[in-house]
Amino acid sequence: MYFSNANFVSSSTIPAAVLPLPSRNYACFRMSHRKIHRSLLSSSVLEFMAGRNLRVLSNSSNRESSDTSTDFDVPFPRDYFDLLDQAKKATEAALRDNKQLMEIEFPTAGLESVPGDGEGGIEMTESMQLIRQFCDCFIDPLKATRTRVFFPEANEVKFARNTAFEGASFKLDYLTKPSFFEDFGFVEKVKMADRVKPEDELFLVAYPYFNVNEMLVVEELYKEAVANTARKLIIFNGELDRIRSGYYPPFFYPKLAALTKTLFPKMETVYYIHNFKGQKGGVLFRCYPGPWKVLRKVRNKFVCVHQQQDMPSLKEVALNILPSS
C-alpha cells in the first residue's frame, strides 16, 4: 500500500515553506487566458505562505500522533495540519475499500475561505505546497518513484521541480502543452498513453480546473491507464463543483458536462470542504467513510445541523438546508 508513517514535522517539509522566488524562465502561469509570471508574486506573499506552513509545523510538534482510524465523527479541522492528517486517513480508508478514483477538495486561502477569496495564482501555489506535504505523509518513500503527479501544463512542472517538489522522487508530469495559439487560451491535450509507464501505480492530478481540456485529459487518463487495473487516481483541488453545478453550459461544453454522467459516478469524494458565507452561512464537510455534514459555527465551534449519505448539491445546501437549520 501507499501508506506512510511520515510525520508532518519531518525535515522534508521545511524547505518547501521557505523557498526563494523562481527565475522568470520557470514562472509562466495561466490566468485569464494569458501568461503572467509567478516571479511577480511579491515576497510578502511567500513570507505569508512560509509563516502559515511553519505555524502548522510548530502546532503539530506539540501534538501526539494518533493511530485511530477515520471514524464517523471527524471534527472540522483546526488547521492545515489537521486537514492533511484527516485527508490522509480518509484516503487510506478509501483504498482499503478498493476505491480507485478519488477526489480531495478544500480551500487553500484559509479553512473558512470561499472560492475567490484568494488570488488565483497564489491559491494554485499554495495547493502545490499542500500537495507536496500530502505526498510526503501519505506515500511510502519506497513507492515514490511509482507515483506520477500530473500538473495542468509543462510550465507548472518546471515551477514545481524548482520549488515545492525540488529533490522529490515523485514523477512529475503534465496534462496539456502549449500550442501556437496559447496566448488566446488554447493548449494541446497530451496523449496519456505516451506519458504513463508500466511501473506507475498511483496518479495524483493537481488542480485541473483552469482550462476545460484538463479534466477531459483526466478522463482519458482514467480510461486508458486506471480502469480495469490495480492503479489509483486522486484528483486534488480540481474545483469539480464548477462542472457539477452547470457552470459550463452543456450546449457549449458537451464533453465537459458529460463527465457528470461518465466519470463522476465512478468517483469517491474522500475529503471535502466548501464554505458558504453570509448570515445563514456554514460548511459542507465530508471525511470518508463518514456522511456528508452541513456545519454551522456557533460560539467558535462547528455544530452539525444536517447530515446525509449522498453528496447534496451546493444549491440545495445554500437555499434549503442552511436557511432551514
Kindly give the residue locations of the regions a language model identified.
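Positively charged, amphipathic N-terminal segments that serve as targeting/anchoring signals
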Residues: 47-229
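Short beta-alpha junction loops
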Residues: 152-156, 236-243
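Short acidic/glycine-rich loop or secondary-structure boundary segments that cap or lie
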Residues: 212-214, 242-245
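A conserved mid-domain beta-alpha-beta active-site/ligand-binding segment of alpha/beta enzyme cores
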Residues: 243-322
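N-terminal chloroplast transit peptides
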Residues: 1-64
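Charged interaction segments
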Residues: 222-225, 237, 246-247, 252
